Amino acid sequence: MIDKDYIAELKALDDNKEAKAKLAEYAEQFGIKVKKNKSFDNIVVDIEEALQKLASEPMPETDGLSIKDLIDAADAAEGLKYDDEEVNPEAALLIDSPIKSDIKIEVVETDKIPENTDVLIEDTPFVEEKFEQAVAEIIESEKPSVFTLPENFSPNLQLIGKNLGFCTVPWWIYQWIAETPDWKSHPTSFEHASAHQTLFSLIYYINRDGSVLIRETRNSSFVTLK
C-alpha cells in the first residue's frame, strides 16, 4: 500500500531533515498529516496506519462526479445547454455563476455609406481539390492534442482500498482539474510544477483503466475522473 521504494530512497538521504520533509509531502498526497518532530521510522509507521484506516473505509455507492458532469453544469450556468438531461446538483454547486459585467458600450454614429456604391465582384472558379484540402486541414487542426506520458513513467499516487481502489488528491489540484475540462491534453500548463507528477499519475490510471476514483481533501468527496 505504501511506496516502499520511495520510502527507501528518502531514508538513504544524508539530510534527515530533508528526508522527513519529503516524507511529510508524500503523506499529504493522501490527506495525512504527520508530526515532523518524530523519527523517520515512526513517521513511516504513522503513515502506514493512516493508509490502512483509509483502506478500511467503505467505498462510495455512486461514481461521484465525472468531467462530463462538470462540463454540463458549466454549460447550464452559461445558458449553453440545449438538451433535457438534468444537471448533477453537486456539479452545479462547484460551478461559479457567471460574473456580470458593467462595461458600457458607446455607439458612435458615422457617415452613412452611399447606397449606390459600385462594388466589383469577381467570379472565382471553384476548385474541388483545394476545397477538400482546406476542409481536411480544418478537421486536423480541430483535433484535440494528445499528451504523452514520459517514457517508463511510474505513478507516484498509490491506489488504496478494494477492487481498483482510489487515491487522495489535494483539493487545489482537483479544483484546477474541475475548472479545466481538457486538462489531460496539457497537464504541464498548471502553474504549480509540484502538482505535475500527480496529474501524470491520474492520466496514467485513466489510460490504463478507463477512469480513476479520487478523494479530494477539502470535502473528502469521491469523484470519478475519465
From Swiss-Prot:
Keywords for this protein: Protease inhibitor, Virion
Chief location bin: virion
An annotated Gene Ontology molecular function: peptidase inhibitor activity
Taxonomic superkingdom: Viruses
Coiled-coil ranges per UniProt: none
Location in the cell: Virion
GO cellular component, one term: virion component
Job of this protein: Inhibitor of the prohead protease gp21. Minor capsid protein.
Protein name: Protein inh
